[in-house]
Structure formats: C-alpha cells, structure tokens
Amino acid sequence: MSHQPLSCLTEKEDSPSESTGNGPPHLAHPNLDTFTPEELLQQMKELLTENHQLKEAMKLNNQAMKGRFEELSAWTEKQKEERQFFEIQSKEAKERLMALSHENEKLKEELGKLKGKSERSSEDPTDDSRLPRAEAEQEKDQLRTQVVRLQAEKADLLGIVSELQLKLNSSGSSEDSFVEIRMAEGEAEGSVKEIKHSPGPTRTVSTGTALSKYRSRSADGAKNYFEHEELTVSQLLLCLREGNQKVERLEVALKEAKERVSDFEKKTSNRSEIETQTEGSTEKENDEEKGPETVGSEVEALNLQVTSLFKELQEAHTKLSEAELMKKRLQEKCQALERKNSAIPSELNEKQELVYTNKKLELQVESMLSEIKMEQAKTEDEKSKLTVLQMTHNKLLQEHNNALKTIEELTRKESEKVDRAVLKELSEKLELAEKALASKQLQMDEMKQTIAKQEEDLETMTILRAQMEVYCSDFHAERAAREKIHEEKEQLALQLAVLLKENDAFEDGGRQSLMEMQSRHGARTSDSDQQAYLVQRGAEDRDWRQQRNIPIHSCPKCGEVLPDIDTLQIHVMDCII
C-alpha cells in the first residue's frame, strides 16, 4: 500500500482540503473566533472525513457514469448494426420491386402484341369462308370454357386484391396515413411512377396495390381479348355459312343448266333424225330451218349461262380454298391461344406467389420500420437522460469546486488564527504520523519481499514435490527390486544353511571315519595328538560360525537387528515415514 503525507490533504488543484458535502456552499459559516483549538481540530477531522466520503461518492458516481456510458456506446453500436441490416434488407426489397416492375412492363408489351394480333385477325376478309357446324360448335364450346375459366380466375384475383386492400386499409389506419391506397383503376405506369417517387413504407405498400391492380387489369384485358376473338370467330362462321349457301345455289343452277343442255341435245338429235327421214317436203324443210335457228340461239344462250356458272363455281372454289386457309390460320391461332391460356394460370400462380412474398416482405419492412422508430424513441429518451445526467454532473462539479474554494478560504483563515504551539503539535503529530507511515511502508515492503520469497519458496516446493514424487516412484521401484533381492538372498541363505548342515554332517562323518581309521591303524600317541588337533580345529570352526552369526546391522530408531544392508535401508525408510 502506498501512503500519502497528511500535509498534502487534497488530490486536485493543490488545495489543502475538500468540501464537507453537508450543505450548499452559499450558507453562512460560523465565526471561528468562538471555537477552541480542540474544537477546530475536531471540525477539521470531520471535514477531512466528509471530504473523504465525498471523494468516494464522486468516484462511485464516476464509475457508474462510465458504466452507463459504455452500455450506451454498446447499445448505439448494436443499433448501427441493426440499421445497416435493415438498410440491406430494404435495398433487396427495392431490387425485387424493380424486377417486378420490369416483369410488369414485359407483360404489358406482350398484351399489346396480343391485342395487335387480334386486331389484325379481325381486319382480315372473311366474306366467303365457311366451316362445318360441328367444328364451329366445338370451337365455341372451347372458347366459352376458356372464358369461364378466365372469369373464375379474375374473380379469384379480385377477391385477393380486395383482401389485400382491406389489410392495407387496416394497416394504414394504424400507422397514421403512412400508406396510400388508390382504388381507381388507372394505368399501371402511373402507379409504378408513384411507387418510384413515394418515400418509405408508402412506396412498399403502393407497389403491392399497383401489382394487384395490374393483375386485375391484365385479367380484364385477357377477358376482353377473348371476347373479341369470340366475336370474330362468330362473324367468320356466319360468313362461311353464307358462302356455303351461295355455293349450294350455284350447284343447283349448274345442275339445272346441264339438264336443259342435255334436253336440247336430245331434241337436236331427234330433229336431225327426222330431217334424214323426211327430206321430200319443202314445207317441212322450211319449218326445220326455222327450228334449228331457234334451237342454236337457245344453245348459245345456255352455253353462255354455263360458262358464267363455271366462272362463278371457280370463284366459289377459290373463295372456299381461301376460307379453308383462313380456317387453318384461325385453328393455328386458337391452338396458340390455348397454349397461352394453359401457360397463363401457371404465370398467374407464380405472380400471385411473388405478390404474396412481396407483401410479406413489405409487412416485414413495416414491422422493422416500427421497431426502428421505437428504438429511435428509446435512444432519444436515453440521450435526454444522459444530457440530464451530464447537467447534474456539471452541477456537482461546480458545487465541488465551490466547496473546495470555501475550504481553502477556511483553512487559510484557520491557519492564520491557529497558535504556533498548536501548529508545532500538529507538525510533530504529522511528523510522527509520517514516520509511522514510513515504518509501516517499510514493513509493507519487507512483507512484500517475504511474500515474494514465500512465492518463490512455493514454486520451489512445487518443484520439490514433483521431484519427491519422482523419487518416491523410483524408491518404490527400488524397494520392490530390493525385496525381490532380499527374498532371493533369504532363499540362498536357507540353501546355504542346508549346505552347511550337510557339510557339518559330512565333516562329522569324516571325523568319525578318521577317528576310526586312526584307531585302527595309528598309534595311540599320535591319536591323542590328532584328536587334540581336530578338537582345536572344530573349536575354531565353531568360533568362526559364531562370529559370522553376530548381528552387525541394527536400526538406529527402533534397534531392530537386520541381516544385511539392503533390508536395513528398507526398514529405516519405513520407520522414518
């Protein structure tokens, strides 16, 4: 711990003391002449304690303000990230809206092309064409079914559009005229322009309404187009019927003319035969001359009628061929229209899905915008709170500075009025306190050094413990090996004892045999010397055995005697542990 001398009583602006914090600085202070030095010292101590409390309070306040500021900065960063995310989503939605507007323009162009084709087909001449009734009725039925299907799809689209408009009306009433819905069936281009120039959520909602209007209008256009096609087909059928009737009339007239020509030919042949039979009479000849002249004129007239009828037949055949070509063209057009009609529902479904997805995105954007507005309101509230806190902080700083100034003035006045003896006592006390603080500082330094040494010792202890664990593991391994060696030594000692016993038995047997041999073959004197030598040798052997069995290895702690050094070491480690 670091110490501060009491002569330096303040931390800021080199002031000797700080504010009391018990009241505002503008209050009138009591006269210092009425107080004794002891009371003044007590007041000084109180002022110092209050100053210390104020310092702690200011530190806590500053820490709280710092924490609050950090939280606000983190929150603002989060808001920035969310705003960036919302901007990216809005850009994607705008791109999708632009793509949908391009698709709408393409569909408009296709509808214009179809209308031009229908007008061209209606302008073609269909005066002298005809079709069979069965095929015409089938085509009429097909066109009627297509018209009914398109009307049903139109009704579905109108229902969807009405639901969307109701939803938009409800959302528009809740958001205070942020949404504008145009119910008039104007042109789609005007709605798209309004979408492009409208800001914020109005643009997103008007796009959905414009698309729904365009869809409904495209369905109406398709219906009108098919009605126009049906009218043109009915007109062509009427023209074909009239052409058929004319052809039938011409065929009947041709048949009648042919019959008349055949009758006249028969008459001429009959008259020629009569002329050959009756050549005598002149009167008859004159009559016959008059008759062929009239017949020739009639034949010429009939030939002229036949040629005119042939010309009319040829014209009728050419008109029939043209009508058949027109029929083929109309059939091809009908097939193309059927293909387009079969492709229109899938396109309508895709467009409906796009409208639904666009609507969902619009609703998401609206919800995000509302959330952003709420967050902006929260940020504004928190900014206002932060400004209030800053104002209070500034006021507290001003009060603190004023208190410091008043304390400086008080300390100056007190320092002028306090006696020299009191000052000496205070200086002595200050010196003693400084010395005590210095001694405590020295003690603290020594304690720090001892703590550092103890930490080093702890580190060495951890190292020593690790070494001890290694040594213990090695020792246990050596102990197990020594136990095995001890067991082997015990077995060898047992074997040696058995061998020694056998050796003693052999030696005793050898002595006895020697004694017997000496008793048998040697003199008695020599026997006595030999016996003495043998007795002496046996005594030496016994002494050597006794010396060998003397216990040398004993434990210094418990005094237990052990046969060898290895077992003694194992026993000593067990006793010590």
From Swiss-Prot:
Binding residues for Zn(2+): 555, 558, 571, 575
Tissue localization of expression: Present in aqueous humor of the eye (at protein level). Expressed in the trabecular meshwork (at protein level). Expressed in nonpigmented ciliary epithelium (at protein level). Expressed at high levels in skeletal muscle, also detected in heart, brain, pancreas, kidney, placenta and liver. Expressed in dermal fibroblasts (at protein level).
Quaternary structure (record): Self-associates. Interacts with HD. Interacts with GTF3A. Interacts with MYO6. Interacts (via UBAN) with ubiquitinated TFRC. Interacts with GTP-bound Rab8 (RAB8A and/or RAB8B). Interacts with TBC1D17. Interacts with TBK1. Interacts with TRAF3. Binds to linear ubiquitin chains. Interacts with LC3 family members MAP1LC3A, MAP1LC3B, GABARAP, GABARAPL1 and GABARAPL2; OPTN phosphorylation increases the association (at least with MAP1LC3B). Interacts with RAB12; the interaction may be indirect. (Microbial infection) Interacts with E3 14.7 kDa protein of group C human adenovirus. Interacts with Bluetongue virus protein NS3.
Region called Disordered, residue ranges: 1-32, 101-143, 186-209, 261-297
UniProt-annotated stretches for the region Interaction with MYO6: 412-520
One Gene Ontology term of the molecular function aspect: protein-macromolecule adaptor activity
Native source organism of the sequence: Homo sapiens
Residues spanned by motif UBAN: 474-479
Cell compartments where the protein resides: Cytoplasm, Perinuclear region; Golgi apparatus; Golgi apparatus, trans-Golgi network; Cytoplasmic vesicle, Autophagosome
Disorder: Glaucoma 1, open angle, E: A form of primary open angle glaucoma (POAG). POAG is characterized by a specific pattern of optic nerve and visual field defects. The angle of the anterior chamber of the eye is open, and usually the intraocular pressure is increased. However, glaucoma can occur at any intraocular pressure. The disease is generally asymptomatic until the late stages, by which time significant and irreversible optic nerve damage has already taken place.
Effect of residue 213 to H: Requires 2 nucleotide substitutions
Phenotypic consequence of residue 474 to N: Significant reduction in ubiquitin binding, decreased interaction with TBK1, loss of localization to recycling endosomes, disruption of interaction with TFRC, loss of inhibition of IFNB activation in response to TLR3 or RIG-I signaling, no effect on retinal ganglion cell death
Compositionally biased residues, Basic and acidic residues: 186-197, 261-274, 281-292
Chain positions covered by the region annotation Interaction with Rab8: 58-209
Record PTM Phosphoserine, positions in chain: 177, 198, 342, 526
Effect of residue 50 to K: No effect on retinal ganglion cell death, decreased interaction with TFRC, loss of localization to recycling endosomes, loss of ubiquitin-binding
Coiled coil: 38-170, 239-508
One annotated GO biological process: negative regulation of canonical NF-kappaB signal transduction
Entries under PANTHER family matching the protein: NF-KAPPA-B ESSENTIAL MODULATOR (PTHR31553), OPTINEURIN (PTHR31553:SF2)
Segments of this protein annotated with the region Interaction with HD: 411-577
Free-text function comment from the UniProt entry: Plays an important role in the maintenance of the Golgi complex, in membrane trafficking, in exocytosis, through its interaction with myosin VI and Rab8. Links myosin VI to the Golgi complex and plays an important role in Golgi ribbon formation. Plays a role in the activation of innate immune response during viral infection. Mechanistically, recruits TBK1 at the Golgi apparatus, promoting its trans-phosphorylation after RLR or TLR3 stimulation. In turn, activated TBK1 phosphorylates its downstream partner IRF3 to produce IFN-beta/IFNB1. Plays a neuroprotective role in the eye and optic nerve.
Outcome recorded upon mutating residue 50 to K: In GLC1E; selectively promotes cell death of retinal ganglion cells probably by inducing TBC1D17-mediated inhibition of autophagy; affects Rab8-mediated endocytic trafficking; no effect on interaction with TBC1D17; increases colocalization with TBC1D17 and Rab8; increases interaction with TFRC and impairs its endocytic recycling; increases interactions with TBK1; decreases self-association; disturbs transition from the ER to Golgi; no effect on ubiquitin-binding; increases interaction with RAB8A as shown by immunoprecipitation in transfected HeLa cells, although other assays in yeast and mice show loss of direct interaction, it has been proposed that the variant might abolish direct interaction with Rab8 and enhance indirect interaction, hence altering the functional positioning of the molecules in the complex in such a way that it leads to constitutive or increased inactivation of Rab8 by TBC1D17
Protein name per the record: Optineurin
